[in-house]
Amino acid sequence: MALPTPSDSTLPAEARGRGRRRRLVWTPSQSEALRACFERNPYPGIATRERLAQAIGIPEPRVQIWFQNERSRQLRQHRRESRPWPGRRGPPEGRRKRTAVTGSQTALLLRAFEKDRFPGIAAREELARETGLPESRIQIWFQNRRARHPGQGGRAPAQAGGLCSAAPGGGHPAPSWVAFAHTGAWGTGLPAPHVPCAPGALPQGAFVSQAARAAPALQPSQAAPAEGVSQPAPARGDFAYAAPAPPDGALSHPQAPRWPPHPGKSREDRDPQRDGLPGPCAVAQPGPAQAGPQGQGVLAPPTSQGSPWWGWGRGPQVAGAAWEPQAGEAPPPQPAPPDASARQGQMQGIPAPSQALQEPAPWSALPCGLLLDELLASPEFLQQAQPLLETEAPGELEASEEAASLEAPLSEEEYRALLEEL
């Protein structure tokens, strides 16, 4: 019987194909002697193995390996057949004496292990001549060393990496996912498609150019971390935000639908003072933005034809969605009734917003929701919007209150008497 050896599938790529020990072919008489000894004791000691090796003409280390492999085969067979393994039979026999390895021999073995963790038969025989140890003991020493220190030694098994397994210079791999980019009249905030990429696969200016095309009004302090590393999106998804995007030719998001103007407010009724308030909430379509004062990027209203302008900080309402008040937020202004045309002149006399509201620099880095809440909760805004919240004229309110105070409600008896008369 041939000496069983580890299959090529269980060995690393560096260990396969090297010089290995010659396959040992067992004769029928040798196999019968080994099996007879195995039936008596599956765990023979060193003395029994040496006598058996001398009787069949085989080195004792090969006899020991045969017994190890035969025990493994029998154990697997018993497990498949759900039979208990008998284990040791009889008193335990003496074991091999521990091989003493000196410091100089250990240094030679360690030096060879650092060069190659899986030495072939020729390298082991050369080490046996240099150290004076048996080749079989050197083989066992390398097996034990690999088991105790799996990460040490040279020529380690190569690990198959993905497209983005490593970065240039031994650093961390570049992110294979691209970031959010607002597109259309009102950015949808949908993530771009997942494109696994190797370092250096994209051009150097791809990230910066795409980020500038997605949101050209980013300030230098905000656009700096957008090169090569994606940043988390703000809490509110309607804020202009740029991050690494796919190169030219990649999949792009569809344009957002164009919404009709508000039904209760025509273009002439809108207040130019209020609509002209600057704010960081409005996101225009990708295109050149008008630069604001002092060289800072400020988003401008979209100039494309057919795209209605809703004013800074305003967006189209989804059809069928009901308004839900938030904490600290005033209700939206209702359309003025026909008989309240006299109050339109009063609205024209509202003073322009203060200088603090016209400065976009302190607010440009804040989310849209916080700016809107702060604006709606200000006393000046509430005082100006109070006339719009009244749905009836003051005279009509006074008349209805007087009529209600003069007419007393009917009692239950009067109500029944009235029903009987009818």
From Swiss-Prot:
Keywords, alphabetical? DNA-binding, Homeobox, Nucleus, Repeat, Transcription, Transcription regulation
Q: Name one GO biological process term.
A: regulation of transcription by RNA polymerase II
Which InterPro entries does its entry note? HD, Homeobox_regulator, Homeodomain-like_sf, HTH_motif
GO terms (molecular function) for this protein are: DNA-binding transcription factor activity, RNA polymerase II-specific; RNA polymerase II transcription regulatory region sequence-specific DNA binding
Q: Polar residues bias located where?
A: 1-10
The cross-references to Pfam families, in alphabetical order and at most eight, read: Homeodomain (PF00046)
CDD domains tied to this protein: homeodomain
DNA-binding region location: 19-78, 94-153
A Gene Ontology term for the protein's cellular component: nucleus
Carries keyword Calcium?
no
Instruction: Give the residues annotated as coiled coil.
Output: none
User: Major location, coarse class?
Assistant: nucleus
| Record organism | Homo sapiens
Family annotation (SMART domains): HOX
Could you tell me which PROSITE patterns the record lists for this protein?
Answer: HOMEOBOX_2 (PS50071)
Write out the annotated subcellular location. Answer: Nucleus
Disordered as annotated region, ranges: 1-24, 72-102, 148-167, 218-361, 386-412
Function, in words: May be involved in transcriptional regulation.
Q: Where is the composition biased (Basic and acidic residues)?
A: 265-274
Q: What is this protein called?
A: Double homeobox protein 4-like protein 4
Q: Spans of biased composition, class Low complexity? A: 278-302, 319-329
